[in-house]
């Protein structure tokens, strides 16, 4: 199974109804697969990536259900930082899928790679504003990574989690299957203290 197909099937399995994001050269390997599952997962493309992150944050606030964002390499992913920071501050579960350069081109500067301190280092940009950042570099790493990422978004205090996926991981194939869903979902958030509400 291709990495992109695995991710699309994962979104279906986890009942992720929307992916908010913008198509780009870095994430093209996931776009066809999202088209194949379009009846279960809708890709909505706003005009700017920051808007995508705010849409995902707002969706969780209203529905208490995590959704995903999808961005391409370099500036495309950099544009989601403020929206993801807002989601972290306000405890909104968001699965931030960011694309990165192909692993075989790490540290060569393609596709606007961020590599001044570490190879393919976009995860360091989001680390201060996510609960955790993952970067699977092979398709066989995706099942565990995706399972841990979605569970972490909703466990404990909800918040955004990043999965940074190199370009070739969307395209390459491996003999892997999805891990079963744990169904860690909450349909409501804790209510405020009634006494504090009366005071307000």
Q: At which residue positions do the language-model features occur?
A:
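N-terminal alpha/beta PP-like core and its mobile active-site loop of ThDP/TPP-dependent enzymes
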Residues: 1-200
């Amino acid at each position: 199974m291709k990495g992109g197909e695995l991710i699309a099937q994962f979104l279906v399995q986890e009942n992720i109804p929307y992916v908010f994001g913008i198509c780009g050269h870095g994430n093209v390997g996931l776009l066809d697969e999202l088209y194949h599952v379009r009846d279960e997962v809708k890709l909505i493309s706003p005009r700017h990536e920051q808007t995508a992150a705010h849409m995902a944050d707002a969706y969780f606030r209203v529905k208490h259900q995590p959704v995903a964002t999808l961005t391409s390499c370099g500036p495309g992913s950099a544009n989601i930082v403020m929206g993801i920071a807002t989601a972290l501050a306000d405890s909104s579960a968001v699965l931030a899928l960011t694309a990165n350069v192909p692993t075989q081109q790490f540290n060569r500067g393609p596709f606007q790679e961020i590599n001044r301190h570490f190879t393919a280092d976009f995860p360091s940009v989001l680390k201060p504003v996510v609960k955790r950042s993952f970067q699977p570099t092979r398709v066989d790493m995706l099942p565990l990574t995706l399972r841990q990422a979605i569970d972490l978004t909703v466990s404990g205090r909800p918040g955004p989690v990043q999965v940074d996926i190199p370009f070739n991981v969307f395209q390459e194939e491996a003999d892997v299957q999805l891990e079963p869903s744990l169904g860690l979902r909450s349909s409501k958030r804790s209510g405020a203290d009634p006494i504090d509400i009366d005071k307000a």
